[in-house]
Amino acid sequence: MVIKVPYVTAATTLFSFGLIFGFGHLRDSFRALLRLLFSSAAAADSPAGCNSKGYAPICVGKEDFYIRRFFRRVQDCFGRPIASKPDAWFDVVERYSTDSNKTLHCTTKTSKCLNLASFNYLGFAAADEYCTPRVIESLKKYSASTCSSRVDGGNTQLHIELEELVARFVRKPSAILLAMGYATNSAIIPALIGKGGLIISDSLNHNSIVSGARASGATIRVFEHNNPAHLEKLLREQISGGQPRTHRAWKKILVIVEGIYSMEGELCKLPEIISVCKKYKVYTYMDEAHSIGAVGKTGRGVCELLGVDPADVDIMMGTLSKSFGSSGGYIAASKEIIQHLKLTCPSHIYGTSMSPPAVQQVISAMKVILGEDGTDRGAKKIAQIRDNSNFFRSELQKMGFEVLGDNDSPVMPFMVYNPAKMPAFSRECLKQNVAVVPVGFPATPLLLGRIRICISASHSREDLIKGLEVISNVGDLVGIKYLPVEQEETTSVEKPKKL
């Protein structure tokens, strides 16, 4: 997927960034002058934020400038506290600032907002008739934490049961649990590959994958996003050239992709990538954080959706904090690989194991999905999120928004581009009781700021229509409908009423 930014949009976006950058440096120059003239008065707000004599400043350079001059202007749009469960609607705590957004203070007031921000894909984050009683019982039996790692005293029967259930669910021989999704990638990848190995990573892979790849010590090469042809070209070059300087053969090669890319909502071209990897005898590692549970006829992710045999993906990673309403992550692979990880991965050996109630939540949610609770609620949830996602995406496109991603994906970003329009859109939606997430640089390229919508099975059709009406009105207000509006004679969704 290549996003072609219109020339006028690119020019105005760069102008906006340039304006903020220029005025930011101008203010810093005046502050430096004031610090020379009135050192004690101006030091308290120095750019480095560090006034202790004799100590090197901790916060310096471009990162410090970006935080002070760019992010501070919009930080009220991020990290908004909530005061309820992250269901289809939740309570957002109102905040205020008396110092130009340097600090934000919570009030006692809350706003009930439509939740288009959370990764609660199947709605399990709310109280559930099957899951919640079992989670409460596990809390009474095991307490909130094991206070130990899996290799010490933190290995409960629940952990063993969930590993077996995960392996069965994703159709792999074995699995390992970790207490955090991010750490699953950042800690597992260095345990799989090291110096003398080659990692070939998609250019838009998640930061946790990037961190894990860098920590591994392996050589890293990046292929064009979701481009199997470029992947094959890169593999041929690297295999023929060998390791840097010595030109010895690589000890192992690992290709890393995501099932659904979290900032694009785009499905991985898995069949084509698997074909290339098989041809050159290299290992595949797929992150299914946003796809497991959310796509596929029975919720088994991208492999099921695209008709790929799970045996063809050597290592499958997933998080438990999205579709399953809990926390943690897993790796599913062959028994030999999982045994190796259990003996070598620092997060497994030294890190505290998953909280038992969190483990029980995943067990219960997974059983609902599999229909082992004696109902068809799981199948209905999977059908509901597919219908909700495709309906919402279709309506956004009809309204003229530039929507990224593929059908069936519950992640649907639409382009905003201009850095001033992102916070304006977010704040105006919040005023109208709709919570959305703006995403900009450095999480995305400089020109490609966007709003990311996440859909849940817990959303009713009325909820989605309400969200579409607000998004359409605010989109008109801030001017982010970059595509022609589809002319149809029909529903109030295409021609939203004034709120």
UniProtKB/Swiss-Prot annotation:
EC number per UniProt: 2.3.1.50
GO MF: pyridoxal phosphate binding; serine C-palmitoyltransferase activity
Name of a matching Pfam family: Aminotran_1_2
Catalytic activity reported: L-serine + hexadecanoyl-CoA + H(+) = 3-oxosphinganine + CO2 + CoA
A GO cellular component annotation in the UniProt record: endoplasmic reticulum membrane
Subcellular location: Endoplasmic reticulum membrane
Self-association and partners: Heterodimer with LCB1. Component of the serine palmitoyltransferase (SPT) complex, composed of LCB1 and LCB2.
Protein name, entry field: Long chain base biosynthesis protein 2b
